[in-house]
């Protein structure tokens, strides 16, 4: 079973609140999950300590077990000082290079 560490949306309309969960890759975004490993509240100030809260020990356990974090969650994990597996780091670097390499729509029209 492929497992991912991803965000599950909660909160009210126009007031998002996310749980960082470990879930089966094929499960719906807000559906069943295996474990809740943290929270993300985008409504708080960016410098707030409570904006992203992660259970470091459980995140490390799931990463060692082979769970793949989504792009956003991988950034949260790095900011929290938790070591990501080398494979995940390389995938993130490749995605960043691909995003930078694409020309904008204006540049594409001019060429």
From Swiss-Prot:
Q: Which Pfam families match?
A: Ribosomal_S16 (PF00886)
Coiled-coil region(s) at which residues? none
Would the keyword Acetylation be found if you checked this record's keyword annotation?
A: no
Which family does the record claim for this protein? Belongs to the bacterial ribosomal protein bS16 family.
Keywords recorded for this protein, A-Z: Ribonucleoprotein, Ribosomal protein
Transmembrane segments annotated in the record for this chain: none
What PANTHER family is this protein classified in? 30S RIBOSOMAL PROTEIN S16 (PTHR12919), SMALL RIBOSOMAL SUBUNIT PROTEIN BS16M (PTHR12919:SF20)
One GO cellular component this record assigns the protein to is: cytoplasm
Protein name in UniProt? Small ribosomal subunit protein bS16
Query: What Gene Ontology molecular-function terms does this entry list?
Result: structural constituent of ribosome
Native species: Rickettsia bellii (strain OSU 85-389)
Keyword check for Cell wall biogenesis/degradation:
no
Biological processes per GO annotation: translation
Stored InterPro entries:
Ribosomal_bS16 (IPR000307), Ribosomal_bS16_CS (IPR020592), Ribosomal_bS16_dom_sf (IPR023803)
């Amino acid at each position: 079973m492929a497992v991912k560490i991803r965000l599950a949306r909660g909160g009210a309309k126009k007031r998002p609140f996310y749980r960082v969960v470990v879930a089966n890759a094929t499960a719906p975004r807000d559906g069943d999950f295996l474990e809740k490993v943290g929270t993300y509240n985008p409504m708080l100030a960016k410098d707030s300590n409570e904006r992203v809260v992660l259970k470091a020990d459980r995140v490390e356990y799931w990463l060692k077990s082979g769970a793949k974090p989504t792009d956003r969650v991988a950034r949260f994990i790095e900011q929290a000082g938790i070591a990501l597996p080398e494979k995940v780091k390389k995938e993130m670097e490749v995605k960043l290079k691909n995003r930078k390499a694409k020309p904008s729509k204006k540049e594409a029209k001019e060429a």
